[in-house]
Amino acid sequence: MNIRTLDDLLAEEVTGRRVLVRADLNVPLDKQTGQITDDGRIRAVLPTLGALVQAGAKVVVCSHLGRPKGSPDPAFSLRPVAGRLGELLGAPVHFAEDTVGDSARSTVAGLADGQVALLENLRFNPGETSKDEAQRGAFADQLAALADAYVDDAFGAVHRRHASVYDVPARLPHVAGRLVLREVEVLGTLTGEPDRPYVVVLGGSKVSDKLAVIEALLPKVDRLLVGGGMCFTFLKAQGHEVGSSLLEEEMVETCRSLLERAGGKIMLPVDVVAADAFAPDAPHDTVRADGIPSKRVGLDIGPETVAGFAAALRGARTIFWNGPMGVFEMAAFAHGTCGVAEAIANADAFTVVGGGDSAAAVRALGLDEQAFSHISTGGGASLEYLEGKTLPGIAALEN
């Protein structure tokens, strides 16, 4: 892959130069208090920002947060992120009240060497996500005018054809940040020749969300362990009753075909935790996966399945995990995710956690992040990379 890196930029002397860093600071906020509930994505960009600060660059950070509708919305402001980023960097971060307006221009103009500014949410401007190339390009022109060089360190957004990811690199000297480089190296290992046995664990709610990655991975993996809400569509494809559990009827035939083609590679739950309702305090017990009672809803994999999955993971040399095994946000239905995560952490293997809900689960369940070889910051981006798709943000860096 022909991509210039942050080290290439640093070698050119960046003291006093304005460097625009596209970060992925799309962190979860508590709906009541507005407090950041998981700062993993902020921490992930620190190596790149720290190197630029150390080198005396004027660092201008930009990011999106949530899905505002192309206009300012206080619920999606990056202001709390500026505060947390400053704490982690050990120096105040200057916050611009807009993205490319008067506040952004004056904030950037006022930066001293080695200082950091954070622009307001990119998605407050309709040009960021516009399908119209002219509108997107006009916004990219304004963003690029704030800087002399561009660093993409937002792996979680490289699968988006957005102005800050795809169009700005065409307007400035551009490089990949430390995080993007590490992500591409790790995922390249998984798509190349991973050490065997290679075991993939997939969870999450929908088969339809994971179908393309299952199709891409099946020929490459030795075992594919399926949990989460998506397992019920596979169980239905085997002819089992799934009660009121999450089911994609239109995917049953597809799952049947996958099971036939997999030749025994796909491992499904043998027991599940079924509840009377989708609620944290609902009465629940463990039932056989091949006969979930009607009106009961499966919300986690059962202990026998956890033990079986753990046994399959024990001898693996490469493991990729994407998607929780159950509704881990409810304590009663977090045991499956926790048990499988611990088995992955304890495996003598190269272990990759594929972003999104899985990364959130590792932190929410208090597991040691250092126990995994790599925790990706890109849920959708990591899956699309494994599917073999061209990622717009990576393509823009290669140009």
From Swiss-Prot:
Keywords: ATP-binding, Cytoplasm, Glycolysis, Kinase, Nucleotide-binding, Transferase. ATP binds at residues 210, 298, 329, 355-358. The lineage of its organism: Bacteria, Bacillati, Actinomycetota, Actinomycetes, Micromonosporales. GO terms for cellular component: cytosol. It is found in: Cytoplasm. This is Phosphoglycerate kinase. Belongs to the phosphoglycerate kinase family. HAMAP family: Phosphoglyc_kinase. Substrate binds at residues 24-26, 41, 64-67, 123, 160.
